[in-house]
Amino acid sequence: MTEYQPGLEGVPATRSNISYLDGKQGILTYRGYRIVDLAEHSTFEETAYLLLDGELPTVAQLERFDTQLREHRRVKYNIHDIMKSLPVTGHPMEMLQTAVASLGMFYPNHVPVQIRSPGDETEQYVYGQSIRILARMATLVAMWQQLRLGNYPMRQRRDLSYAANFLYMFNGEEPDPLVARIMDVCFILHAEHTINASTFAAMVTGSTLASPSYVIAAAIGTLAGPLHG
């Protein structure tokens, strides 16, 4: 007979094949690579590819991946209008959850009725949508900052890296290269933290074959909770 565990306390949800964390020893690895090495030698774009694909990219693969991220940074005016209608006093996480959930309405690009069963077509769809959401996430945050200040959001710059473009859109001016690199490292350090509450929420939502925008919106809502940590 299975013992009842309220709140799943002490019950392992799953084992991560993506990252390993040992807080006591100060160890964090992504796909077997030490975080200190990635922070020193990698970029956020390369690290994101590593997390999504499982292996570090070749030069050609990284160029193609980076191009995809740059191509999908822009968001439709419909998303801008939705964000503009939100109260500027609202919490940024509430805005982000709303905006990400709305992406699925304007950028469906989905496998017909929603993903009937797992398979190659589904994996390609999820991978493509993950890239699109990742590309637009920083844009949404930067747009919200400008809207809160009463400004019109800055246009994205495809000549800038992911981190540099975020800072440019967020602050309204091109960042110093050192500041952009610091932001890049911050993105690397926060890219993956094993099976926490928001990851678990994403796994539960994804297990129903919900679209990626729903999955990430659920994770954002969980991340916003004060007990998440």
Residue ranges and their predicted role:
Residues M1-L227:
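Hydrophobic alpha-helical bundle cores within soluble ligand-binding/oligomerization subdomains
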